Design a protein with these regions (language model features):
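Short, motif-level signal for alpha-helix interfacial/capping segments enriched in acidic residues
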Residues: 1, 128-139, 185-195
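Noncatalytic, basic helical substrate-engagement surface that gates or grips nucleic-acid strands
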Residues: 5-150, 156-174, 269, 274-289
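Non-catalytic nucleic-acid-binding/docking modules located in mid-to-C-terminal regions
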Residues: 5-10, 55-65, 82-86, 118-121, ...
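Intrinsically disordered, low-complexity segments enriched in polar/charged residues with Gly/Pro
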Residues: 108-109, 152, 192-197
């Protein structure tokens, strides 16, 4: 497995799950602007981004925003992510909770404006989840580069390989193949299949009753190997166990639920199946045609206009100084 010390930094691409990084700071970072407005999402996002760029010196850097969800997934399963609720700031209580939806969206607008003044490329594809965009960029557009995906979302574990590594802002560490195997008993190459079987409460995807990652890994040890296991192979193995007289309920539950697992696999897999041709073209065009630029003075002015006086702009721009501008 390639180690970080072996990286050719000129070939290291940083892919940032923008809303994932932003929301963890929006709900927890207490920073306020000079007029008392909450700006924690902005400051936390920029601070984490600066630290990651300083540590890994990636070039280029892409910040990928959510595009309003996936109509294709909702067509497959109408209840997909239907339980999601607006984020709430964790330091307000009862009736004192402000309009967090408005506050969240306003800070995102400010962040988008600020990032335009840096040599960072922002990617937004309508009717598309950031997961799919990052999946495409990682698997295809930057196939031969080393990718670092900045996200705490386990959905991206299926992308981990010798050429793709995840940096978790929650754990403050790199997540590589062995970490996934050690924690889940499943290799990243089989992570999407395992998730299709076990389900995902965070996305409102029901799994097979009585089957979690621990049970699945125990009953199907081949999932821990660096070899892709197909759904049909999994079903065949489960059916064989049942026919051989196994009393383990997990085998029967899996063997009897091919349709559910196949549907879930369509929902959780990050590949081109959930992207339209025009969306793929948009991703390619953005990546190929972006011309980095920087405007530090305007960046400072924009921060001051929002009452943000505590962020160290010099450090951010120094961290990004290795990215050549047009």
């Amino acid at each position: 497995m390639r180690k970080m010390s072996d990286l050719n930094r000129s070939q290291t691409v940083l892919l940032v799950d923008a809303m994932g990084l932003y929301l963890r700071h929006f709900v927890a970072h207490p920073a306020m602007g000079k007029d008392g407005q909450h700006v924690g999402g902005i400051i936390g996002f920029l601070t984490d981004l600066k630290k990651i760029v300083e540590r890994f010196n990636p070039n280029p850097v892409y910040v990928i925003w959510e595009g309003g969800g996936s109509p294709r997934r909702r067509a497959i399963f109408k209840d997909y992510k239907s339980h999601r609720r607006p984020e709430r700031l964790n330091r307000f209580y009862e009736d004192d909770i402000p309009n967090t939806v408005a506050g969240r969206d306003n800070q995102v607008k400010i962040l988008v404006k600020l990032l335009k003044l840096t040599p960072i490329c922002q990617v937004y594809v309508p009717d598309c989840e950031a997961d799919d965009v990052i999946g495409y960029m990682s698997r295809y557009h930057f196939k031969d580069a080393l990718k670092i995906i900045l996200s705490a979302d386990k959905d991206y574990y299926q992308l981990i390989s010798e050429g793709s590594i995840i940096y978790s802002p929650t754990w403050k560490k790199l997540i590589q193949e062995q970490e996934v195997v050690d924690r889940f008993g499943v290799h990243p190459v089989n992570f999407a299949l395992a998730k299709a079987v076990c389900g995902d409460d965070s996305d409102n995807i029901p799994g097979i009753e009585g089957v979690g990652f621990k049970t699945l890994a125990k009953r199907f040890p081949a999932l821990a190997l660096d070899t892709s296991v197909t759904l049909q192979e999994l079903l065949t193995e489960a059916s064989h166990k049942v026919e051989s007289g196994s009393k383990v309920q997990a085998y029967k539950n899996i063997a009897d639920n091919e349709v559910l697992i196949q549907r879930n696999l369509s929902l959780v897999t990050l590949d081109t199946a959930n992207l339209a041709a025009y969306q793929i073209k948009r991703i390619n065009d953005i990546c190929d045609n972006f011309k980095p630029s920087r405007n530090k003075i305007e960046f400072i002015r924009a921060l001051l206009n929002e009452g943000i006086q505590t962020f160290n702009v010099d450090q951010l721009f120094l961290a990004l100084s290795h990215i050549q501008t047009s």
